């Protein structure tokens, strides 16, 4: 069940759904707008010959923070990681679905590639997978509305929510745009 604006406010007021900082004007009819933080993670194209999900490649990306008051310019065909300004904390019976903003999509900005699902129990900044599919650069302003988070009520609480031991919650408590930790899940067949 998708939560309405009334249900979202009730969950926030009850302290079950955490959004920090919270701005009530960001609550939409069935979602909460999310804003862009000021840090970005860009790919260092000269450090590696290719990306290998099985390998830890610590220098594959580096953090870039625009000068205060300046935008980050995302060029055509570029892919960078960003994150939400807000920290989200979901209880064991609520999950989230991150979607882009229609107005930004019409400019060629994709907010996430594949990781739009937020597990119950997650707590942290949401990493954004930002792509410019337009043929002109797009300016990304820290603090701008960058997406919307829909909250879904589970039919029952999760038995092992994100963050539980043994679940492999690699991104619990993440701060800022967090690089891939796919190597932690990689199993080679022999």
UniProtKB/Swiss-Prot annotation:
The record marks 116-117 as: Important for bifunctional activity. One of its GO terms (biological process) is dUTP biosynthetic process. The keyword ATP-binding does not apply. The active site is at residue 129. One of its GO terms (molecular function) is dCTP deaminase (dUMP-forming) activity. The keyword Nuclease does not apply. It catalyses: dCTP + 2 H2O = dUMP + NH4(+) + diphosphate. Keywords: Hydrolase, Nucleotide metabolism, Nucleotide-binding. DCTP binds at residues 101-106, 119, 127-129, 148, 162, 174. Its EC number is 3.5.4.30. Gene3D superfamilies: 2.70.40.10. Pathway: Pyrimidine metabolism; dUMP biosynthesis; dUMP from dCTP: step 1/1. InterPro entries: dCTP_deaminase, dUTPase-like_sf, dUTPase_trimeric. Residues 161-190 are annotated as: Disordered. Residues 171-190 have a biased composition (Polar residues). Bifunctional enzyme that catalyzes both the deamination of dCTP to dUTP and the hydrolysis of dUTP to dUMP without releasing the toxic dUTP intermediate. NCBIfam families: dCTP_deam (TIGR02274). Belongs to the dCTP deaminase family. Homotrimer. This is dCTP deaminase, dUMP-forming.
């Amino acid at each position: 069940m998708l939560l309405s604006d009334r249900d979202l406010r009730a969950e926030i007021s009850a302290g079950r759904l955490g959004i920090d900082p919270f701005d009530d004007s960001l609550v939409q009819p069935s979602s909460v707008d999310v804003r862009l933080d000021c840090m970005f993670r860009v790919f260092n194209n000269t450090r590696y010959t290719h990306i290998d999900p099985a390998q830890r490649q610590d220098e594959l990306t580096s953090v870039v923070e625009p000068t205060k008051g300046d935008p980050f310019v995302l060029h055509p065909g570029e892919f960078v990681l960003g994150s939400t300004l807000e920290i989200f904390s979901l209880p064991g019976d609520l999950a989230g679905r991150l979607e882009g903003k229609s107005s930004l999509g019409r400019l060629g900005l994709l907010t996430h590639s594949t990781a739009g699902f937020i597990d119950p129990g997650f707590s942290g900044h949401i990493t954004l997978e930002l792509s410019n599919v337009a043929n002109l650069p797009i300016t990304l302003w820290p603090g701008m509305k960058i997406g919307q988070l829909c909250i879904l009520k589970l039919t029952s609480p999760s038995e092992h929510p994100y963050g539980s031991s043994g679940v492999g919650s690699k991104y619990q408590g993440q701060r800022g745009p967090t690089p891939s930790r796919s190597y932690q899940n990689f199993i080679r067949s022999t």
